[in-house]
Each structure stands twice: as C-alpha cells, then as structure tokens.
Amino acid sequence: MWPCLTICLTLSLDCLRGTPEGSPETAPDLKELGINYTLKKSASPVPNRIHILRIELAPRKVEPAVVLGPDPDGDGPAEASLTDPREMASAPSVLAFINTNPWDSFPDAKGRKNRRWHSGQPVDIHGLAGTGGKMRSSGNPSNTSVWFDNEGRVRFGHQAGDEPVVATNGFQMIVSNGALTVGEGGVRHPRTAIGSDKKGKILWLVVVDGRQGGYSEGMNMHELASVMKSLGCWTATNMDGGGSSVMGLRDQDGTMKVVNSPSDRFLGRVKIRPLPMVLTIRDATDAQEQE
C-alpha cells in the first residue's frame, strides 16, 4: 500500500490549474454518467499528486473517442500535426480527456529531430491510433495497445483479426492478470496510465504529476503499477508520459479544465504541450445528437 491523503473532489475545480474552454448550455452530472474524479496526495517515498478518473463503461452512458490533430500530408509519413489538447477536446459532448500514444518528430537531412514541440509540427504516432473503426496509425500485433470493442469494453493488446473501434497505444503493460509485470526501481517521471477491471467494464485513467520538487516528483514503473493495482486494475498499461501527461475534466459550470499540473514550463508558468491525439470520454447521448 502507498500512504496517501485522499481528496474526493465534488468537481468544484476552480482552484486547480487549467484554461477555460467552451461550455455546454447545461453542465453534465458526471457522477450520474458514471465518472468519478479523485485526487490522491502521496507523501512517501516522494511527494506526488495522483489524478484518477474511474469510469463505468457498462451502462453505455459515456463512450470513448480518440481525437487526432489534422493530418498534414495525406498519404505521407506524418500522421498528425501537434495540436493543443484542449482544442481537440473542445466539443460540448466531451466530459474528460487524457494523453495516450508515444510519438516523435521526423529527422532533418542531417538526421536531427526537432523536439522543441510546437503547434502544427508534423509527427509520427507510435502504435494503434484511431476512432470509429478507422485507424490513422496502425501497428503490428502487440500487448501495448489499449482499445475498445463494439460493445464498449476496453481491451489490452491486439492480435490479427481484432477489430478495434477506438484505439490507442502505450509503452508497456505494467499490470497483467492482477499482478505487477515490472520490477522495482527506475527513474521517476510524470506518468499517464490506463487500466481496467477483469471484464473491461470499468476504466481507470490516471495521471501522476512529476518533475516538480516538493510538490509532485513523479513515479517509476513499479510505483505506477502499484497504484493501478491498488485501484482494482486487472490490467494496466503505461502510456506516454513526461511533459505530455495531461488530464482534462468538465467542471460543474460546464467548463473544460486541465486538472493536473503538466511539467513543461515557459517563463515559470505551466505550458500545455501540443499533442497529436487525445483519448476523450464523451456523453453518449450528447455525442449522438451532434452527429
């Protein structure tokens, strides 16, 4: 067990860091839709702030959807242009979002990659990425994919013949069959993880803030896996982390806000890193009305 002080927020997130976005006419009741947000503060072995979304998929009141940045070159090598994640999650039906897949820039003529990320930058997405059954980025069969089937269940790892409806990809599986699959030790970073119960009907989205000494210093793989198992995850995967780790949630007033503290900074202020894609959780009824 990891010692922590648990703060179960009632989604009055005015004091948390974020940037307001467009609001629906009526703020959604997230708990009624099966979404619960918890912030856990851990003091040992280092200070950490752990943002947890528990989502009930079975009632089908909400649905996952991947939103990708624009494709800059059609059939060319780039699969998306980096975009502010809040922009990708700006539809009124979106209730929450997190970052998912690893990605990288393309080398120039001298083999150098520009990792000074900026909006509009063309990038290559690693692994499966798509929504509505259409994959923008494909990948070989792997246990690092996290996808949703046509019954709305979350699945981990894909094989030839699988038909993902919504798909993302991580770095490595950290919990399998209820047991940790990673050893102790390692470097601490900001982290994003996705996990589920044995039946794939309860989804956990987790972001751990990091690289902020004395406030939230991040986790290694073993610490992250321990968190996911303690939540009740039968399976969990480590997604892209570092400065990309971000979680957004719609507040009681209907405003979409970033609830975590991303590690990137510009002139001492939080800088939200542009991303190629996000996994959103949408109000299923609202989404159907908008289509």
Q: Each PLM stretch: what is its role?
A:
Residues 3-14:
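Bacterial N-terminal signal peptides
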Residues 13-291:
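Gly/Ser/Thr/Pro-rich low-complexity, intrinsically disordered segments
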